[in-house]
Amino acid sequence: NRLVFGGTLAQPDTIWMSQIGKYFNFDVGDAEDTDSFDLTAATGQVNEIRYMVSNRDLQVFTGSGELYIPTYLNQAITPTNAQIRKQTPYGTEFILPASIDGATIFVQHDGHTVREYLYTESEDAYTASAVSTLSGHLIQHPRFMTVVHSGFDLADSYAFLVLESGEGALFSSNRAEKRASWTRVTTPGMFSSTIAVHNRLFTNVYDAAGNLHLCEFSEDVGLDLYLYKAVSTNTVDVSDLYNSGDVVDVIGIKDGKQSYLGEFTVTAGEEVDLSLYSESAFTHAYVGKAFTAKIVSNPIDVTSGNGPVTGDVRGISNVILDLKGARSFKINNRSFSPDNALTGKKEIRVLGHSRDPQV
């Protein structure tokens, strides 16, 4: 129960801890258990302290390595038992590390690698394994990172990184089931920053016109940067967000049911004309930008009775998709637009042969 500071210009590798329960008292006194104290990371080099995370222990992230101050069972950290131990040599970028699924993830100082700082019983030490090895091309100088736990009504935890390019990278982790994955996230415009509040994920987004918006990730509507408006005389006013000439997607609402109407061009009056659907009598509409979830499989490879078939001409005959509320999808340039949203498994037969067959 102490206030902890780490690193100054004069003493970049020093940590100061206040007296217990007295957050503004840093008097070292007589080195009693409740007194304040300071520690220097004497590891043979200057460790510029950048961040500290209170997790299983007090984890210390520096520009040249990862350290920690161990805690002891049923014992508080005191001036007589406190010590700093160096664990891994990678160094941390100027991005706040975050706890996720029992570990702490951080961006390595090169700006291209995300690592997982985790205590392992087998080594009796902390390790910092890379979790972005197969997706290193997605990690391009992150600027912000946040974690949402059990977000979107799912069991997994998610880390969202805002990249220098304005794109996003989403990391999902479920350690109990040994599942982890990376996904590139884009938007019309660019992501600026991000923050998680409980199980909700927010981000600042600059649209194509340079306007700043506070947005929330939600699965309610399959549109990006959308407006919910009433339909009046077969038109929808979108002047709050869109300009004349913008191409938008529209979902019509009637009796609580959603129907995807397609793409529309905003008129000179900054409205969307729904005259083609006047007979449907839609009362409200969602107007926004459609986004695409794209998955590209690795080349399918198997081992036959004669050995691996790598490099042989082979084909994929059928694909089974596990869908949730899908209103349209495309497989190998074949488009599908069911009358009603599909949820569940859907089998699609495909044609073609290749030495590296993919879907």
Task: List each language-model region with its residue ranges.
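Catalytic-domain carbohydrate-binding cleft regions of carbohydrate-active enzymes
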Residues: I84
